[in-house]
C-alpha cells in the first residue's frame, strides 16, 4: 500500500497556486489539491511537496498562467498573469526549493503557447 504522494502535479494550476493554502472545500479550490493537502487551508502544494524530502524535483509550471487567456482569444486580460507577478511567484517557488531541499532537479521551459494543437487547423482534405 502506497502511503506517500510523490507527484504533486495538479491539472490547471498556476504558479501562484503553488504558494497559497488550499481550502478544504473542493468546491472552493482546486479539486485534487483539497484531496491531498496535509493540512487543508494551511499547507501549500509546494510546502507539502518539499516536506516529503524529494530526491529529484521537476518544476514544470507556468503554462496555465497564459493558456486560458490565449485559448479565450486574448480577450480577457484579467485572467492573464502579468509578467511582474509571474516573475515574483516563480522566483518564490525556485527560492523555496533551493532553500528547503538538496534534491537535484530540472526547471522546464514554457513552450510558445501558439505551438499547441489548439491553435492549428487541418484542412478538410489533409488526410488522403
Locations of regions flagged by a protein language model:
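Conserved SGNH/GDSL esterase-like catalytic core that processes O-acyl groups on lipids
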Residues: 1-92, 114
